Amino acid sequence: MRVGMGYDVHKLVEGRDLILGGVKVPHTLGLLGHSDADVLLHAIMDALLGAAALGDIGKHFPDTDPAYEGISSLKLLEHVRDLIAKKGYVIENIDATVIAQKPKLRPYIEQMEQNVADTLQIAKEQVNIKATTEEWLGFTGREEGIASQAICSLTGLYEASMQVGGGCSGCGGCQAD
């Protein structure tokens, strides 16, 4: 089993949509970035890439490349999924936290989880997303930006096939002996 951790921060600005977990969240401010600046998906991608020892999103999707300008981070997550699979890993689980003073994210969490699960082709039960504030402290508390942290676990295909109970919780394509 391999574990990865991801962290990302983006500044809140006027004139941009707030996209978190592939969901357009109603808010007066949005996140500044080269892509759609989806801080949640960026943290998840970094966790996945880290667990597979594949670097980080800056390596794969540099902000100097015009091909990624304004791109949906869900598209980038698809590419990360393919890199993970090509290296022989399946995703066991993802746990992520969004840190934002505003807006309240509870109404959007379930759709965020579904978007991540659908894009990664895993069960929704393998994805957990939480939201919290920093009680008006720091840059997130002052509503200057939003941060996200994520952790994931991956299992190699062979290791997963040897697990008791029918293999890993990934694609469902293999079964334990």
Curated annotation (Swiss-Prot):
Note describing how the cofactor binds: Binds 1 divalent metal cation per subunit.
Keyword Lyase: yes
This protein's pathway: Isoprenoid biosynthesis; isopentenyl diphosphate biosynthesis via DXP pathway; isopentenyl diphosphate from 1-deoxy-D-xylulose 5-phosphate: step 4/6
Binding-site list for 4-CDP-2-C-methyl-D-erythritol 2-phosphate: 8-10, 34-35, 56-58, 61-65, 132-135, 139, 142
UniProt catalytic activity: 4-CDP-2-C-methyl-D-erythritol 2-phosphate = 2-C-methyl-D-erythritol 2,4-cyclic diphosphate + CMP
EC code: 4.6.1.12
Annotated site location: Transition state stabilizer: H34, T133
Enzyme class of the recorded protein, top EC level: lyase
Residues given in the record as a divalent metal cation binding sites: D8, H10, H42
Cofactors required: a divalent metal cation
BP GO annotations: isopentenyl diphosphate biosynthetic process, methylerythritol 4-phosphate pathway; terpenoid biosynthetic process
InterPro entries, A to Z: MECDP_synthase (IPR003526), MECDP_synthase_CS (IPR020555), MECDP_synthase_sf (IPR036571)
Family: Belongs to the IspF family.
Function: Involved in the biosynthesis of isopentenyl diphosphate (IPP) and dimethylallyl diphosphate (DMAPP), two major building blocks of isoprenoid compounds. Catalyzes the conversion of 4-diphosphocytidyl-2-C-methyl-D-erythritol 2-phosphate (CDP-ME2P) to 2-C-methyl-D-erythritol 2,4-cyclodiphosphate (ME-CPP) with a corresponding release of cytidine 5-monophosphate (CMP).
Classification via NCBIfam families: ispF (TIGR00151)
Name of the protein described by the UniProt record: 2-C-methyl-D-erythritol 2,4-cyclodiphosphate synthase
Organism of provenance: Agathobacter rectalis (strain ATCC 33656 / DSM 3377 / JCM 17463 / KCTC 5835 / VPI 0990)
Gene: ispF
